[in-house]
Amino acid sequence: MTPVRLGVLAGIVALVLDQVTKLWLLYGFELARKGVVQVLPFFDLVLAWNTGISYGWFSGQGPTGQILMLAFKAVAIVALAIWMARSTTKLATIGLGLIIGGAIGNAIDRLAYGAVVDFALLHAEIGGKIYNWYVFNIADVAIVVGVAALLYDSLIGLPAAKAP
């Protein structure tokens, strides 16, 4: 399988997993009605509607802000797709595919609901104090793993084979 096809496949898998989990948690599991659901001592399911970007930055910007964020995301997705089409390593194309799939998943939420559906909360109690990570979703995980793959590929990965 060519590197680009691997990237496209990674993006499709990330997008499908993201949307299926969100739809199931919203409409099958009814997370909104259940509130906080403890899965493990350090992991809860909790519904959060993120109208901003990472960590809720730029939330509350209204319809104009939502349109601007979607437009920026569309441009970024096109740029990442061009980069993926030109990439020569499998790891880079997989990483770019994961980022694209995650970005599209969150963009679908923004179009459908006016906010991104976040649901996973990691936390730890240390010395009697509770520390929470931000609430995230599968698309966010795909984006982070994709960025990590790109960093690894560019800093440590094997050089791409040269064409004859």
Swiss-Prot record:
Ordered alphabetically, the record's keywords are: Aspartyl protease, Cell inner membrane, Cell membrane, Hydrolase, Membrane, Protease, Transmembrane, Transmembrane helix
Location in the cell reads: Cell inner membrane
| Gene Ontology annotations for the cellular component aspect, listed alphabetically | plasma membrane
Which pathway features in its UniProt record?
A: Protein modification; lipoprotein biosynthesis (signal peptide cleavage)
Work out whether the entry's keyword set contains Transmembrane helix: yes
> Which GO annotations describe the biological process of this protein?
proteolysis
Family, as annotated: Belongs to the peptidase A8 family.
Q: What is this protein called?
A: Lipoprotein signal peptidase
Q: Which organism is it from?
A: Rhodopseudomonas palustris (strain ATCC BAA-98 / CGA009)
Q: Which gene encodes it?
A: lspA
